[in-house]
């Protein structure tokens, strides 16, 4: 799947939005990728995650376990794992706390794992996911996402693969360009849902 075909999946689903958005990182942007619109369509999700699995296999070879950060990474992680013939697990956070691996999930010695995300903006969720796995016996070989909107700057401490890399500008709330500041902001993300 080419980068243009990936973006067309988002456009045709109405998931490539323009406006003034408050991202889950707290940064602001004029562009938002509404991945839950994508994930509500099983056929579209299957196409994208099959392509991601192909990219992962080409770079990392055998993968035994896909680890995803809850909530946004669970669907693409599961579907990508299905195409890899791997197990799908996830990390989750207690309200206000770090990600942890619970529910009996583990990465045993001798296994190869990859972190799968939906969209990477700053890389924070993937970094926090990786930090939560530091005591696991298996090897976390890399990370992958559908779209890296950081322009390749979302450093997570592992190789990061994506179907598309975009350089979508983000801004601190006190450093908005005038044209963005003139539009009332909306917060479509989910990270704040876990905060009290």
Swiss-Prot record:
PROSITE patterns: PUR_PYR_PR_TRANSFER
Organism in which the protein naturally occurs: Methylorubrum extorquens (strain CM4 / NCIMB 13688)
Substrates-to-products reaction catalysed: orotidine 5'-phosphate + diphosphate = orotate + 5-phospho-alpha-D-ribose 1-diphosphate
Source lineage: Bacteria, Pseudomonadati, Pseudomonadota, Alphaproteobacteria, Hyphomicrobiales
Protein name per UniProt: Orotate phosphoribosyltransferase
Cofactor(s) this protein cannot do without: Mg(2+)
Biological processes per GO annotation: 'de novo' UMP biosynthetic process; pyrimidine nucleobase biosynthetic process
Subunit text: Homodimer.
Amino acids binding orotate: 121, 149
Keywords: Glycosyltransferase, Magnesium, Pyrimidine biosynthesis, Transferase
Described purpose of this protein according to its UniProt entry: Catalyzes the transfer of a ribosyl phosphate group from 5-phosphoribose 1-diphosphate to orotate, leading to the formation of orotidine monophosphate (OMP).
SUPFAM superfamilies membership: PRTase-like
InterPro entries to which the protein is assigned, alphabetical: OPRT (IPR023031), Orotate_PRibTrfase_bac (IPR006273), PRibTrfase_dom (IPR000836), PRTase-like (IPR029057)
Binding site for 5-phospho-alpha-D-ribose 1-diphosphate: 117-125
């Amino acid at each position: 799947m080419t980068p243009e075909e990936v973006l067309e999946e988002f456009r045709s689903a109405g998931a490539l939005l323009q406006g003034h958005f408050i991202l889950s990182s707290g940064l602001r942007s004029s562009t938002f990728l509404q991945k839950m619109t994508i994930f509500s369509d099983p056929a579209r999700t299957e196409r994208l995650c099959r392509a991601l699995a192909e990219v992962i296999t080409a770079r990392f070879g055998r993968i035994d376990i896909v680890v995803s950060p809850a909530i946004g990474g669970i669907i693409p992680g599961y579907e990508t794992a299905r195409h890899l013939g791997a197990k799908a697990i996830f990390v989750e956070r207690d309200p206000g706390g770090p990600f942890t691996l619970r529910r009996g999930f583990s990465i045993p010695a001798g296994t190869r794992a990859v972190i799968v995300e939906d969209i990477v903006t700053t890389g924070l969720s993937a970094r926090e996911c990786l930090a939560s796995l530091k005591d696991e016996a298996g090897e976390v070989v890399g990370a992958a996402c559908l779209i890296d909107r950081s322009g390749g700057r979302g450093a997570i401490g592992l190789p990061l693969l994506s179907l598309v890399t975009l350089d979508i500008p983000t801004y601190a709330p006190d450093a908005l360009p005038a044209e963005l500041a003139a539009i009332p902001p909306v917060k479509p993300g989910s990270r704040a849902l876990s905060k009290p």
